[in-house]
């Protein structure tokens, strides 16, 4: 169905209230057009009138950012300029068919990213201090020469382990242009041709859940497709907010709503913040203190066990460590889960609803009611987003939440789930090969600032170094491709700033990006990248329910200014480094695409020819199994299809974790345990630091941005203002009214931003949407609302991941 914008809408003046209303109803249609809005700062690019010229071309492109989905965009081009953007018009509106994949307000504003005043125009080198944003223009030849010469020098002096590829997800889903995982990028291919680089494991999105549930299920914890909710009777979401994080027609929220219409399943949301996933569509919202999800689960488990609401047959057949019958011989007496819950374990504390209530803030009677509902309603889709795991106790919390699905036997069945985040059907499309990294050493993606500061001191047992016992050298060079984690998305910005400012520590930082981001200001050499609209690639889906798809992301316009593609940049560098043939294999970017497409057609015979696909724009295929069901084969035959855990079963008790707990060097307050227990972790609401900083600060993914991407699009910033959310009770104590400027502060930094006083926040908790662009004044007080000024670089115990939601702060009116 083609999107049409009525003339009356184009002619009307839009108020902010009207804009917000339009956002809710129609996905911010004006962001996809060039409608001029009455805001003070608008990214004026070109004449915004919708063209009627006969020479208009409609070219397929894509939004390839890190929301979890990818969306097709149909660009209307006249005289080489994008005039307006529409989304998918293929397929139908039938949920059970090949439905349309409609972009959200972010993707529809792509034109404003392409023509944004912040676009990088030409190569530059730093002339001021890192972070000042002072650069001078240089030629591409000079930029290539500086990078190649200095990289060769650093490799000669320190070895390839001193070269680091930083985390970046600004360009996701592509076969050629993808920026994540860094090990699968063209920069990695270049480095692998030159002897390799220091790799990293984990990611800022899901480090703790990936590590925690690995010890429960083995490998990445899979989940049922959200489309399978049509077979569910109950949906329970822990910190899972697809209504804002994955809100497009290709994302989870579409499947959640459509599937619930079929099943009429009750939906319960457990979150400190009343999210847009609820917004009147949920049946119950249960606010909870951040970081206490495991305590809630333990209280629920107590009711289920004492009232015989657990699936004992499932626990006996498929699990290790629920009770004494399946407890490993190596475990201590009463070291099983049931003993821990009933107070018969080492701590001697029964995890009653009253015990859980004191910790979580959830009333005991509500815990009892919820336990009975979960224990008596089957199948139940129990899932967790990646918010609960982004805590100091994140790994152990993810294992605890998954226990609800395990206790009730909802794993491996239609309408159930594993307790992990939802999964999806995917196509075996072939991506660009990046060769093998000769360097086997890796660090946590969150520990790179420590690797600059104290690299040779970092060990396997204390800092999570993998591949060897310790690092030999510090990081001396950083590649930062399509990522804002150099400063904006990394925790404790003020500490990072101090480390990066000393260019005798990390001697070379190369940033490749499209815009002058907060991280770009810390570059030594700054290279202007092409947007997705300025080059050809294939864009692949991710969280797409049970209909997988591939988008032909064609070149819509010529590269602006002096921008070049990542393939051209890395090919030119390969030439200077003497590895051009090995890197390119004699192919151009389009030739690589045709080569990869031919390989993909062998795996997916239904794909049309390259030229037909280019015209078609998008290829869609539904899951032939109907719905993806995680661990279905294991459930049907655990002997023939064991899990990849040491026992081949679901490990409630993990001997591997017991061994780690006995050997790793952990700071005081960090806990690794073989059972999914509750431990508060550092800087919890129970921490003595609470007397000085009495409010918990948590983050959330805001609908106007994808992390920091789109954070410089003024129409989105105006429609969805960056504000600190605070409960009226906490605001009243501090004399704060809605819209007041407040200071949020702790020992790590200070942020000034407007307050949003709302009952949608739990008392005692404040929240900032993550991803706002860091904007410090001369005293390094941030005026942009960037949460990472206030977060800590102390890593989580097991994954060594980012505990971005574990923060204590104070808030005062400015």
Where are the predicted features?
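N-terminal export/assembly segments and adjacent metallocofactor-ligating motifs
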Residues: 2-309, 335, 354, 460, ...
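Long, well-ordered, tryptophan-enriched scaffold segments
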Residues: 262, 273-377
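Long, contiguous, secondary-structure-rich segments that constitute the structural scaffold
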Residues: 566-616, 708-710, 714-725, 729-814
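A glycine-rich phosphate-binding loop feature that marks nucleotide/adenosyl-phosphate handling sites
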Residues: 168-169, 317-320, 374, 417-427, ...
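Phosphate/diphosphate-binding loops
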Residues: 507-508, 555-574
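Extended redox/cofactor-interaction regions of prokaryotic respiratory oxidoreductases
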Residues: 2-7, 182-270, 277, 295, ...
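Active-site phosphate/pyrophosphate-binding segments
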Residues: 333-334, 338-454
């Amino acid at each position: 169905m083609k999107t049409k914008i009525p003339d009356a809408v184009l002619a009307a003046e839009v108020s902010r209230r009207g804009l917000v209303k339009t956002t809710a109803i129609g996905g911010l249609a004006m962001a996809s057009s060039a409608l001029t809005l009455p805001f003070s700062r608008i990214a004026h690019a070109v004449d915004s009138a919708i063209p009627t010229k006969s020479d208009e071309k409609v070219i397929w492109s894509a939004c390839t950012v890190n929301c979890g989905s990818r969306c097709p965009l149909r660009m209307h081009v006249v005289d080489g300029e994008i005039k307006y953007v529409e989304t998918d018009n293929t397929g139908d509106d039938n949920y059970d068919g090949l439905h349309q994949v409609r972009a959200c307000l972010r993707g529809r504003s792509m034109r404003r990213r392409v023509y944004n005043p912040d676009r990088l125009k030409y190569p530059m080198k730093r002339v001021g201090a890192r972070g000042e944003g002072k650069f001078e223009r240089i030629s591409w030849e000079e930029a290539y020469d500086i990078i190649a010469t200095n990289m060769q020098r650093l490799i000669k002096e320190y070895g390839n382990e001193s070269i680091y590829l930083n985390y970046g997800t600004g360009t996701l889903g592509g076969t050629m242009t993808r920026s994540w995982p860094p090990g699968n990028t063209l920069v990695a291919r270049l480095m692998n041709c030159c002897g390799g680089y220091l790799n990293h494991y984990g990611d800022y999105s899901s480090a703790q859940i990936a590590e925690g549930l690995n010890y429960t299920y083995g490998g990445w914890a899979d989940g049922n497709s959200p489309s399978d909710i049509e077979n569910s009777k109950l949906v329970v979401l822990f910190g899972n907010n697809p209504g804002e994080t994955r809100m497009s027609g290709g994302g989870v929220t579409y499947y959640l709503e459509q599937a619930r219409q079929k099943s009429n399943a009750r939906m319960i949301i457990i979150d400190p913040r009343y999210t847009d996933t609820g917004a009147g569509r949920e049946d119950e919202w249960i606010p909870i203190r951040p970081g206490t999800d495991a305590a809630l689960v333990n209280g629920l488990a107590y009711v289920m066990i004492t009232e015989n609401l657990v699936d004992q047959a499932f626990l006996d057949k498929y699990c290790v460590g629920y009770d004494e019958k399946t407890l490993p011989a190596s475990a201590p007496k009463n070291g099983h889960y049931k003993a821990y819950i009933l107070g018969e374990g080492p701590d001697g504390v029964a995890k009653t609803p009253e015990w859980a209530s004191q910790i979580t803030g959830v009333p005991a009677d509500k815990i009892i009611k919820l336990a009975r509902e979960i224990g008596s309603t089957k199948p139940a889709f129990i899932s967790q987003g990646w918010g609960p795991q982004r805590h100091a106790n994140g790994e152990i919390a993810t294992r605890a939440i998954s226990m609800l699905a395990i206790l009730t036997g909802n794993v491996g069945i239609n309408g159930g789930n594993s307790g992990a985040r939802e999964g999806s059907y995917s196509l075996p499309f072939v991506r660009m090969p990046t060769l093998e990294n000769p360097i086997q050493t890796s660090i946590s993606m969150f520990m790179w600032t420590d690797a600059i500061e104290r690299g040779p001191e970092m060990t396997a047992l204390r800092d999570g170094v993998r591949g060897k016992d310790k690092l030999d050298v510090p990081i001396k060079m950083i590649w930062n491709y399509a990522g804002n984690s150099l400063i904006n998305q990394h925790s404790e910005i003020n500490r990072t700033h101090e480390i990066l400012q000393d260019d005798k520590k990390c001697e070379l930082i190369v940033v490749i990006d499209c815009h002058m981001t907060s991280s770009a200001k810390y570059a030594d050499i700054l290279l202007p990248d092409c947007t997705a609209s300025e080059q050809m690639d294939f864009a692949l889906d991710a969280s797409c329910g049970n209909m997988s798809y591939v988008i032909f992301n064609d070149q819509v316009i010529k590269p602006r200014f002096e921008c070049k593609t990542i393939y051209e940049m890395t090919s030119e560098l390969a030439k200077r480094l003497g590895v051009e043939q090995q890197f390119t294999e004699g192919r151009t970017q389009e030739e690589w695409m045709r080569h990869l497409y031919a390989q993909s057609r062998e795996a997916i015979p239904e794909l049309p020819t390259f030229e037909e696909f280019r015209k078609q724009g998008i290829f869609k295929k539904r899951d032939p199994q109907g719905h993806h069901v995680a661990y279905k084969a294991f459930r049907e035959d655990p002997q023939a299809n064991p899990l990849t855990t040491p026992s081949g079963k679901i490990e409630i008790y993990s001997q591997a974790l017991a061994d780690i707990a006995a050997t790793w060097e952990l700071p005081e307050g960090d806990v690794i345990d073989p059972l999914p227990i509750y431990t508060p972790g550092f800087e919890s609401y129970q921490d003595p630091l609470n007397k000085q900083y009495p409010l918990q600060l948590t983050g959330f993914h805001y609908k106007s941005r994808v992390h920091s991407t789109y954070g410089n699009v003024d129409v989105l910033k105006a429609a969805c203002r960056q504000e600190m959310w605070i409960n009226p009770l906490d605001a009243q104590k501090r004399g704060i009214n809605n819209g007041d400027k407040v200071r949020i502060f702790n020992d790590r930094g200070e942020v000034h931003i407007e307050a949003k006083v709302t009952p949608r926040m739990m008392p005692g908790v404040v929240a900032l949407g993550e991803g706002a662009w860091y904007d410090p004044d001369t005293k390094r007080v941030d005026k942009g609302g960037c949460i990472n000024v206030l977060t800590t670089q102390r890593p989580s115990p097991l994954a060594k991941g980012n505990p971005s939601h574990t923060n204590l702060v104070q808030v005062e009116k400015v």
